[in-house]
Regions:
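Extracellular glycoside hydrolase catalytic/binding regions
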Residues: 22-23, 176-325, 329-345
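Sec/Tat signal peptide C-region and signal peptidase I cleavage site
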Residues: 14-18
Length: 400
């Protein structure tokens, strides 16, 4: 009897330690490890581990990560391109960026990542994210890990680096690989309270009518991913986004995990109560926390109005993105590198391999291409970038 009592007390103590040390869902709100209500306020480290063409001002050119990588390979060769990308990932987000985010008054960063960095045998993803997590810990920031690009593609667009179709819902092998990667990540971070949770799939299933047939398959895929996470990690919150770019919560039944949070994204709509009403109603109906994982790409006035609306409704938020080229709609922006107009003009040709003679004639010189990407590595560093004070003020952040 004493032994049974001892084991029971040990189990209860362990559960209490997990709940006490980790931020978690508690009713319709998120709470910190001490049980105090926690409203997440932060930014997305977009364009770091998943590149998007518009954030490089590649109008009319490559938009997905693999298309951008192919362009760099074409212009400076595969060896120099591989070296460039390693240096890019080291330079785009540094300790100075994380320190700045904390000093501005934010408490959270969301890290969009490509699954390829976490496949067995490639440890670069863990090395890069571990470094940021350590900086975040020192600055008292929380980290959310976001699978922006899942095996097979969860969206079927440029943002998930897919083949233009959400094959994840058709392909069991892709689902299994996604589950295995989340299991690896959960095993790695299971005892790290700086990591607040796992955003399992970014913006699944677009609004295109032909693809909404996959809405009914989304929650079953989430169940597989949650099971994989829970096999290694009982501490962290799992985050589920709705269909149609994380906007449609009608695809969800009752919550199936006691430590879950639901996320929505909202862009380009009037910043009024009706914009968040469905999500607030979902929160109240199911007694679960909600989080606005992405919004932005708008004027400072709009950003300020929507941010206030979220705060008034006690909704956590992370605006998109933290940094991009020549833009006011981000906390930080960097200048266009030298020779970049030549790069943009070449990238917009879409010539492919069908007319290599014209492509070679149109391409910038190797010297100019190398100079452009070397200058890009300089421009993206925090010390060479520009802070957008108006955008920060709109987010209620501290401007120094």
């Amino acid at each position: 009897m004493r032994w049974i009592l001892f084991v029971l007390l040990l189990v209860l103590a362990h559960d209490g330690e997990a709940q006490g040390g980790f931020a978690h869902a508690e009713g319709k709100f998120f709470v910190d490890g001490a049980g105090h209500k926690l409203i997440l306020r932060g930014t997305n480290l977009g364009n770091w581990l998943v590149q998007e063409g518009y954030m490089f001002r590649l109008e009319g050119g490559p938009q997905s990560a693999r298309e951008i990588e192919a362009m760099v390979n074409e212009l400076i060769g595969p060896t120099d391109a591989a070296k460039f990308w390693h240096e890019y990932r080291d330079a785009y987000i540094t300790r100075k960026d994380i320190d700045f985010i904390a000093k501005a008054g934010f408490n959270t960063i969301r890290i969009p990542f490509h699954y390829k960095f976490f496949v067995p045998g490639d440890e670069e993803g863990f090395a890069l994210v571990d470094r940021v997590v350590e900086w975040a810990k020192a600055d008292h920031l929380y980290v959310i890990l976001d699978m922006h690009c899942a095996p097979g593609g969860q969206t079927g667009a440029n943002i998930d680096d897919s083949w233009g179709y959400p094959w994840l819902y058709e392909d069991e092998a892709s689902q299994q690989q996604a589950a295995e990667i989340w299991k690896r990540i959960a095993a790695h971070y299971h005892d790290n309270p700086t990591v607040v949770g796992y955003d399992l799939l970014n913006e699944p299933i677009p609004h295109y009518p032909k693809l909404q047939q996959y809405n009914s398959k989304l929650e079953p895929v989430y169940r597989k991913l949650v099971a994989a996470v829970r096999s290694e990690d009982k501490n962290h919150v799992v985050i589920l986004g709705g269909a149609q770019w994380d906007t449609n919560f009608s695809v969800f039944g009752a919550p199936f995990d006691k430590n879950a949070m639901y996320t929505f994204h909202k862009y380009w709509m009037p910043p009024v109560q009706d914009a968040v009403k469905p999500y607030v109603e979902f929160r109240d109906k199911y007694n679960v926390p909600i989080w606005m994982g992405e919004s932005g790409e708008n004027t400072d006035e709009w950003i300020g109005q929507f941010r206030k609306l979220l705060d008034d409704n006690e909704i956590s938020w992370t605006f998109w993105p933290y940094k991009k080229m020549e833009a006011k709609s981000a906390p930080v922006t960097f200048a266009r590198p030298e020779h970049w107009d030549e790069i943009v003009a070449y990238a917009a040709r879409h010539a492919g391999m069908g007319d290599t003679e014209k492509s070679v004639a149109a391409r910038p010189s190797l010297e100019d291409s190398r100079a452009a990407f070397e200058d890009l590595l300089r421009k993206i560093r925090f010390e060479n970038a520009t802070v957008n004070d108006g955008y920060l003020k709109a987010l209620g952040a501290t401007v120094k």
